Amino acid sequence: MPKVSRKTASQKIEMDGLEVRLEHMQGGYSVCFESHKADANLSPLFKGLPDDRCDLPRWGYVLKGKTSFQFADHEEVYEEGDAYYVPPGHIPVHHGGAEIIEFSPTAVLGATMGVVMKNIEKGAS
């Protein structure tokens, strides 16, 4: 698929306070269009990954609001208009009202989401 928009993305994921439109692109990358409806620290969802942190590298752009990522020794905050790269080893923190676009390697995204979904099934939120 050579291009995608929020409206044309083939997958939709909704969880408490989060809506994601997702498309797997050619070249081994996926794009996520995210709307954060509520504040949320997602720490419990990454239990079982290395250091119980997200191991997904992310390249993103903040369309509206802000998003942040907690590392073992610091926190990074990105606000409207910021482009960013976040390496593996973080915890995403959602801020209500934020809208972001992120790109990640499809294979790593799939493996990470497998762990996240198992944790959700076990009652993590």
Language-model features and meaning:
Residues 4, 20-22, 33, 59, ...:
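Conserved hydrophobic/aromatic beta-strand scaffold that supports enzyme active sites
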Residues 10, 45-53, 119:
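Vicinal oxygen chelate
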Residues 14-50:
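A short glycine-rich, His/Asp/Glu-containing loop-to-beta-strand
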Residues 26-27, 70-74, 95-97:
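Short strand-coil-strand connectors
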Residues 51-69:
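Short, conserved beta-strand element in jelly-roll/cupin
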Residues 71-90:
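Short acidic-glycine-tyrosine-enriched beta hairpin
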Residues 88-113:
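Ligand-binding loop in jelly-roll beta-barrel domains
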Residues 114-125:
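Glycine- and charge-enriched low-complexity intrinsically disordered segments
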